[in-house]
Structure formats: structure tokens, C-alpha cells
Amino acid sequence: MKKLWIALLMAVCLVGCREDEVVVPTEYDVIPEEVKPGQKCIGMYLLNEGNMGSNKCTLDFVDFVQGYYVRNLYAERNPQVVKELGDVGNDIQIYGSRIYAVINCSNKIEVLDARTARRIGQIDVPNVRYVRFHKGYAYATSYVGPVQLNNPNAVQGAVYKIDTLSLKTVARCTVGYQPEELCVLGQYIYVANSGGYMAPNYDKTVSVIEIEGFKQVEKIPVAINLHHIKADAYGKLWVTSRGDYQGVHSKLLVLDKKMGRNEMQVTDTLDIPCSDFCISGDSLYYISTEWNNYSQSNAITYGIVNVRTKQKVSDHFITDGSEKEITVPYGIAIHPETHDIYVTDAKNYVSSGVLHCYNQYGIQKWSVRTGDIPAHLCFLMRK
């Protein structure tokens, strides 16, 4: 693939700004993309996690208008930031005109201009995991305590309420242990609690926070070691359980309202392992890399579930056989207009990964090298 290097002068200037660090300059790869007339989606950001402790979280950008994949964008746009993005990128979202990049082990949410990727500021949140938004506020899950595996005395997690104008925390609500993804639905925030630091005594609940009073009003028993939670168009919540990596397998669960009441409960359990998923229309696209401690290996699967019928309709969405090129499927997203499918490959977790693009029929369009552990994607829309 044709590669265009940014001007040598820029690289020299960047290195000059970091006396003790060598900064990898931004790279541009040509990709076969174009924006059709009337199309609102003009780009996609990809946050590369970077292996824990390596301080190698990076930001890439897919430019649908110009047909470029832009690698390591943050360092070029923000040469004054000494340690760049930081350690372990765990989530990325766009709200209004800003990017919110969650940098887990750097205990912060980095706030950038969505058009330029230039730094606006940061929000300090300890061991922060995911962020969502509602009426001018950001809500971020936090483990609260330090990174400490196998800690039976780990503290309960929390959701931080942040004013998106001042970038200041205005309130905090205690939830379950090691909370992961959260979802705003109606007047409530639903939080998937994992208890990941407390294995084998995992948490098994979804916390329910009333937005107006910002208090936890309920804990719904669901399954152990929860991770992702998303709502479909019918008001149901889809939740993933990672299991215990041994005898209890990963699965996908459905929460819906109790008959005649506002409370949610588990209505369906699908024995489908799921590491990550996204919902497009009535279709839930999932990927699974299920680790087993006994076999010391991953079981890799893909598929589609109809969210209306709650039935699996396919055990694959890549139809041309090119999934064999993927070593570790790690992240997934669906283009909101073209319905192209994006799957990231973490490879060996310590070197560059790959982003694969497939059309809506599952035929590969292109692949491109990314940063280390490509994981989280969000789309940039026209103003």
C-alpha cells in the first residue's frame, strides 16, 4: 500500500520538542474510500490501547473524504504534550464538537477538538473505563482504586458526573465492583459491573442510576464478570458476560422491562460468547475471542443476532473467507450510512495491529496497519 511520510522538517521539529523521546511521525496510507453525495459521515477515529505499562496509546484517523488512513495523529497535532496520550486507551466518543478519549492507566479523559484532534484539556478520573453523555454532562465509570489484580479487598467503583463545559467533576455515585461500560436509556444510567479484580468472586450485577437525583436505585442480578452494555431500538439492553475463563463461558444476555413496570430484568440468555458487539438496525454484530485458562488458547467466533427476535441468524458476517487473516479480533464498528463493517486485529498485543474494512455483504474492501492493540472506534459527522 502506498505510504506517504509527513515532511522531514515536521519530524525534526517534533523530536526537538521532546528532548528525551523519539516521537514516531504521522504516517498516511492511501485507502479506497470516498464520500458519496449527501453522506454525513466524513471520518472515523481509532484509539489504539497500547500494551499496559508501555505508554503507547495512540490515535489514528480514517479520512473518508480524502481517502487516507492517518496513523499516530495525536503526536503531530500536540507536540507540546510530553507523554502524548498516555497508557491504555479504553474508550473514545464524540460529543458535540469534542473527542473524549478515555486513558485508563493514566487516570484521565483527554478532551480534543473533533475536527483537528488538538488538545483542549483533560478530566482527571482514577482508573477510568468508559464514558457516555446526557444533556451536557459526561458520565464516566471508574474502578476508583489502583490497578491491582486478585484483590479481594478492592473498593467499590463509581460513576463520575462531569460538566462538559468546565470539564470539572460535579458529582460521584458509588456502584458495583470494577464497573465497565455504561448506557443511558430513558431517565436511567445502566452500569455493567465486572468485579474483575476480585476473581473468582466476580460481581454479577447491573447498577441502575436515576439521572435526576444521581443515585443508585437498584442492582439487577445478571451474570458474572459483565463487560459491555448497549441498548437496541426497542428499549432492551444487551449485556455481555466474560465468564470466568474456565468452566463458566462467556454469554450474551437481554434485559427488558418487567410486565407493566419500569424495572428491568433478564429475559433471555444466549449461549453466545461475545467480546464486543455493535448494533445496526435490527442486527447485532458480535466478535468473540474467548480465552480459556485450561487450554491456554482463544476460541474465536463471529456472528449476527436479530435483536427483535433475539435469535442468532448467522455464525459469520465475513463472507469471503478473509477472516483467516485475523489473529485476535478485538474491536468492531458499523458505518452509520454505508453499513461497512470494521474489525480490528490486536495480533500479538505488543506490536502494530490491523484494521479490516468489509462492505455490508461481508466482502473485504481494504486492510491497513494500525497502532498497538487497535480497539475503540467512533465516527465523525459533518457539521
Residue ranges and their predicted role:
Residues 1-4:
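Positively charged n-region of N-terminal signal peptides that target proteins for export
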Residues 9-10:
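Hydrophobic alpha-helical targeting segments used for export or membrane insertion
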Residues 13-16:
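C-terminal motif of bacterial Sec signal peptides marking the signal peptidase cleavage site
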Residues 18-383:
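Predominantly soluble domains enriched in secretory-pathway, periplasmic, or organellar proteins
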